[in-house]
Amino acid sequence: MKVLIAESDDFSQEVISILSKRFDLKVSNNLSQKKFEEAFLEYDIIWFRLRYNLLNIDNNKNIRCKFLVCPVTGINHISKVFLEKNEIYLISLKGEKSFLKEITPTAEHTIFLTLALMRNAIRSIDDVKKGNWNRDIFRGNELKNKRVGIIGYGRLGKMTANIFSAFNCDLTVFDPNFHIEDEISYRKAKRIEDIFKFNEVISIHVDLNSTTNKLIDARILKYCKNAFLINTSRGEVLNEVDVIKAIEDENLKGFAADVINNEAIDYKESELFKYNLTSESNIILTPHIGGNTYESFEKTEKYVLDKLLNLINK
């Protein structure tokens, strides 16, 4: 079987060694989107992360690929129709709850973004690089004892809430999948509006689906009162135009995100990306680096390799 690793930067050498002994392996790190799509005609197994998208790939070609390995939790950059039509088995981390309890970097990044936002860290660093030393203009806020709202109480929501609790934050959580009998460690909100009405820091951790697409819009944001909003889930859960208006109207005191709308196809078309280029507002955008650590790459690549080999050996 022919295997292509299409994103080889910082790839587990142990996994490469195992693959090279069992398969005809090619390792690449500079394929264009077009060449990546053409690889489905040549390889049996293709391995990639988030660099490419499979949303507009031609379904009418003679596809050879039978296994697609993508060691990430969010797979909205991959067409389900394409996979089903060509009988390609997707191996990802989506739904791997037990394993993912050990993968913490996105929760850590959420806390970093929160602190950086509240303390004006990025703007103060940039100002020092310009040769200034203006302490007073970057006075910030403490995280300790703040009212924090968590939207989405799955793996990452729980993990992030537990870290916030170390700062003695007053936590309220909302999840549309809550049941009355669910036992949780923190106060439970019945409506998402209550999260925005009563909290000073709001962190989003929902999956992207038909229910959560544009979940946060003007209808919800109008309840904010000078809050800090952080999104490390998916860019599409926000209406970016409405977020920008909330920033300009000072309903939001600051906004930070590791994800933007439509980033898998053309990040430059994101309204938040364009706004951030010239805005002087308190905004932080990072290029989807939440799970992007050496440690997590090593762990996740070994895990999906085991899944792949188990399937092939059946």
Regions found by a protein language model. Name each.
Residues E96, D170, N226-A227, S233-K314:
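Rossmann-like dinucleotide-binding domain for NAD(H)/NADP(H)
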Residues Y52-C65, T211-L229:
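Rossmann-fold NAD(P) dinucleotide-binding segment
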Residues E38-A39, K61, D194-I195, I220, ...:
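Structural alpha-helical scaffold elements that stabilize or flank donor/cofactor-binding regions
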Residues F40-I45, N62-K66, K197-I202, K225-A227:
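Short acidic/histidine-rich motifs immediately flanking catalytic phosphotransfer sites
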Residues M1, D136-N226:
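Rossmann-like dinucleotide/phosphate-binding beta-alpha-beta segment
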Residues M1-I45, N168-T172:
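N-terminal glycine-/charge-rich "phosphate-binding" loop or analogous flexible N-terminal tail
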Residues D44-I125:
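Phosphate/diphosphate ligand-binding glycine-rich loop within oxidoreductases
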Residues R51, T73, E200, H205-L208, ...:
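Short glycine-/small-residue-rich Rossmann-like dinucleotide-binding loops
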